Amino acid sequence: RLSPGSPYSGPDLLTGPGRSEGWTESIPVVLAWRANPGRHTSEYIDDDGWKQSITEAGRKQMEKLSEGSWNSSRWGELLDSAEAFSKQSGLSDDASRSELVDIGKNVSLRAGLKTDTSVLLCMLGESIAIVPRDLSKEISLENLLSELTAEGLDVTLTQLGPLS
């Protein structure tokens, strides 16, 4: 996103306050979450301190990301910004979320994918996304599913890609 808000909103998803740029590429994504999460996002998202922290962290990352052309060469930068946002906003300081990220990193390590994957905190709820670090290198994330399930998480393998 280049400006806050969803670029697509309303009943027909035609217009919204945000503006975004991107590219289309098939990218596998493992999503993992607890069946019974601790705090629900609604318990803190309206807190003025959290709003300020999240807004400032988002603004800093958007400033960096809004410069230059958008194509797959920016993937690593996007991953770095996602991690920086979770730290700067304080969301990654939450013990329950931090534990989820650690589980994802340990599972990636055991699967021999530590250097090939990035474990990212999802910003709403308590969940993580595990994605490849290098889009030009084909890796299988399927091995992570059973390991994450063994850790007590619900999981799914999905992908980013062209809109149908």
Spans of model-derived segments:
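Short hydrophobic/aromatic beta-strand micro-patches
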Residues: 129-133
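Active-site proximal loop and beta-alpha junction motif in alpha/beta enzyme cores
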Residues: 60, 114-115
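Active-site signature of cysteine proteases
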Residues: 115, 134-139
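Short amphipathic alpha-helix segments
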Residues: 93-114
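Glycine-rich phosphate/pyrophosphate-binding beta-alpha loops
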Residues: 126
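Short amphipathic alpha-helices in soluble, non-transmembrane regions
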Residues: 99, 103-104, 139-152
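Short beta-strand
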Residues: 118-123
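ATP-dependent small-molecule kinase catalytic core of the GHMP/sugar-kinase superfamily
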Residues: 1-87, 94, 135-137, 149, ...
